[in-house]
Amino acid sequence: MSKYTILDKINTPSDLKLIPESQLKILSAELRAFLVDTLDVSGGHFASSLGATELTVALHYVYNAPYDNIVWDVGHQTYIHKILTGRKDKLVTIKKDGGISGFPKRSESEYDTFGVGHSSTSISAALGMAIADRLQGKSSNTVAVIGDGAITGGMAFEALNHAGGIKEDILVILNDNEMSISDNVGGLSAHFSKIISGGFYNSIREKGKEVLKNIPPIFEFVKKVETQTKGMFVPANFFEDLGFYYVGPIDGHDVTELVKTLRILKDHKGPKLLHVITKKGKGYTKAESDPIKFHHVAPSFHSGENITTKISKPTYSNIFGDWICQKAAKDKRLVGITPAMKEGSDLIRFSQLYPHRYFDVAIAEQHAVTFAGGLACQGLKPVVAIYSTFLQRAYDQVIHDIALQNLDVLYAVDRAGLVGADGATHDGSFDLAFMRCIPNHVIMTPSDENEAYHMLEFGYEYNGPAMVRYPRGAGIGAEITGSLDLELGKAKIVKQGSKIAILNFGTLLPLAKQLAEKYHATVIDMRFVKPLDEIMLDKVSQTHEIILTLEENCIAGGAGSAVNEYFVAKDLSNKIIVRNFGLQDKFLNHGTKDLLLAQSKLCVENISQELDKLI
């Protein structure tokens, strides 16, 4: 007999609505158990979905998706949503090749109203949907679900300001668990914590309700006017000042209260915000105790069987973490900045050793970059540790605030290139292209851990904006040497061959070496995308017939394009054959990195096929 007696009856939200409300609590427990059992096989984002279980059940119980729009922010918390919307049997394939996405994806399900993976987008998208439906005569409801981490992003406030200003009928649910991935920081987070802590208003409100319940007519009246009397007890609510009808905070794990509240708010027109308090990792003791560790789990995390051994080689993030701690010990001007990615960027040790020189600015990439500019103006040496996919959110600041003024800022760009299971929303496919066109920048692409370490050092000492991009995961195990012969804009010949030259940008050097063995090709580790080693390019063009460029970045506008531009400017394009190999002009689905590289023709077999046609 199945242990999922209620869940087995549910494949769609229509099935969910047939379940008696009295059984929703049991269903929530079954959903958590199913999530544990499934992710123990597949792995995936875990703690966030545990924390949003009752909220997800209540939303699909009250609202009529997909006619009603439920828009999720970031998407880490949507596994329960996927289970309830026809993907229960596919959950075991999540983030696998050919399986379902780890995030909401419009092409995957009509219930996924808006594709997501980055934060702070839900309110803007939901507002657009609400207005579009209204203009087309639809009577649908629109809900945006956003966490207390994501709501610190500036875009969320822009959308709140717009929605409140035009009085659009939209519900924003603030899922407040006091923790996104890393601990939340900033004034707004402190504001939420103060509300949760049980201040005077919440105390008197609950005690007053107990008394007034004995006088039903007055109790009902007070409930209706409650929001109008808040000012008697507390300062004007932040969200009400933005034009929202504010309700909360309420218990996000009381499914009965959630259903009741959502039904009331469904009939209340205009902008409203429901503030729910949840616990990340709810229902799984270890995840409740350490939600950061259990934010994402590997297969067998629960059963303990076939536990993957730890990676013996350090990751590129570890290399950065070591470098910044060592450099900070030598240079008191160094300050480290991250937009809410302390763990991912390996800044934990730095934050502990140098708390007054460590700044987690929350999910605020634009602010992170300009903040770094301000620090640089006053003589400090800021290092911005940021994922490639998030750097693109601060593009204007990179150009206008840093490059234009030639400020001394080092970008340590993590997760450059393909990231694998997280898919297109998290791939670092574009940074070389969008950074290369900006004046005053130095751009470096290390081929191994040792180059990464010394390029960070070089970029730090360089007087002006500099960027070092490195991939997710471990490298080849290169030893960190005491020094490295590194000169601005100078490449290194790794292997001398003939006829074919392979210009490598980044960590595809092992691939270049494999090709060189097969074709007796010259291999050059270019090291710098900007400035290019033009002397080396001149030499190669004079001594070789075919030139290949390799990069884990989009071909359009990338490092290979820079090589092409140089050869065209020198009138060499008709004298040599140049082929660029990099990421194709399309968004890739999730899968293993090796598979995605092969799909991008970045493997020996595919490149050999192209070479054989040219020889």
Swiss-Prot record:
Its cofactor is Mg(2+); thiamine diphosphate. InterPro entries: Dxylulose-5-P_synthase (IPR005477), THDP-binding (IPR029061), Transketo_C/PFOR_II (IPR009014), Transketolase-like_Pyr-bd (IPR005475), Transketolase_BS (IPR020826), Transketolase_C (IPR033248), Transketolase_CS (IPR049557). Catalyzes the acyloin condensation reaction between C atoms 2 and 3 of pyruvate and glyceraldehyde 3-phosphate to yield 1-deoxy-D-xylulose-5-phosphate (DXP). Pfam families: DXP_synthase_N, Transket_pyr, Transketolase_C. One of its GO terms (biological process) is 1-deoxy-D-xylulose 5-phosphate biosynthetic process. The keyword Transferase applies. GO terms for molecular function: 1-deoxy-D-xylulose-5-phosphate synthase activity; magnesium ion binding; thiamine pyrophosphate binding. The lineage of its organism: Bacteria, Pseudomonadati, Pseudomonadota, Gammaproteobacteria, Thiotrichales. Thiamine diphosphate binds at H76, G117, H118, S119, G149, A150, N177, Y284, E365. Binds 1 Mg(2+) ion per subunit. Mg(2+) binds at D148, N177. Signal peptide: none annotated. It is an enzyme of class 2 (transferase). It catalyses: D-glyceraldehyde 3-phosphate + pyruvate + H(+) = 1-deoxy-D-xylulose 5-phosphate + CO2. GO terms for cellular component: cytosol. Pathway: Metabolic intermediate biosynthesis; 1-deoxy-D-xylulose 5-phosphate biosynthesis; 1-deoxy-D-xylulose 5-phosphate from D-glyceraldehyde 3-phosphate and pyruvate: step 1/1. Homodimer. Belongs to the transketolase family. DXPS subfamily. PANTHER family: 1-D-DEOXYXYLULOSE 5-PHOSPHATE SYNTHASE-RELATED (PTHR43322), 1-DEOXY-D-XYLULOSE-5-PHOSPHATE SYNTHASE, CHLOROPLASTIC (PTHR43322:SF5). This is 1-deoxy-D-xylulose-5-phosphate synthase. Its EC number is 2.2.1.7. Keywords: Isoprene biosynthesis, Magnesium, Metal-binding, Thiamine biosynthesis, Thiamine pyrophosphate, Transferase.
